Amino acid sequence: MKWSWLVGMSVLCLGLEISPAVATEQLVIATSPSMRIPVEALGRLFEQTHPEIRVRLFFDSGLDIRRAIAAMENSSIGQYFIGSGPIHLVAPGGDELITRLEWRYYVLPGTKRPFAEVPLVMVVPEALVDAPTSFEALAKHETLRIAVGDPELTTLGQRTRQLLTTLGVWGHVEHRLDKASDTRSVLDHLLNGEADVGILFGPDAVQESQRIRIVAVSERGIIPPVIHSMAMERYCPNRALCEEFLGFIQSDEAQSELRRLGYASPSSQSMKKRNKP
């Protein structure tokens, strides 16, 4: 991958119509397509109180983001120096990827900030009146068919099995599971009447809130959380601006917006632990 690919990368301008005369500086975030909705929302909020800043997003898969940064930094043609790179922040989706970037020093150690957790939620069609109100209640509702992601094929299914097993429910409901190949199929099975309830990730459920409703949310601490973090790219061109944005994504205003989108706020303990240099 050539470094020039990054220099000429296509970025997406976010929502506010800020005139070039007002927006004098860009803040570029490299992120994965799966993180588009929350990172866009954070960017818009930040622009509202920083009219001189235009937040732009560069999209690629987490693995390709890592490769692109590596190519940019290791190329003898396109080497950057501290404070001169094209990327400010990195939000690849999932802390495993961002930890790998830390190990390679592609992001600055000590700058990782968790901003969202991804809960599992139980959903039902809007028309269903007598719905269970907890995951544990699934064991008692012996006639309910449950749409879940296939644990052998999907992360959603693996997380669902882990949660229900930890709660002591999996063995009681396994014969009633309608296993689907992806999130879209879980929704289709539920809305087509092939299942009575479904289990999804919170953000996916919120996007379908006009057709389904959430009746239960997994509690923190039952299974290891899925955490999304953001960190400063090693050659970030404006560290003060990056630090301000990293602080903003953990603010009450930002967290309220993320909860509206179906995410959970990282625990205060998680934030403190990851904020240590």
Regions found by a protein language model. Name each.
Residues 1-4:
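Positively charged n-region of N-terminal signal peptides that target proteins for export
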Residues 6-17:
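Bacterial N-terminal signal peptides
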Residues 22-50, 54-73, 77-88, 92-277:
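Exported/periplasmic ABC-transporter solute-binding proteins
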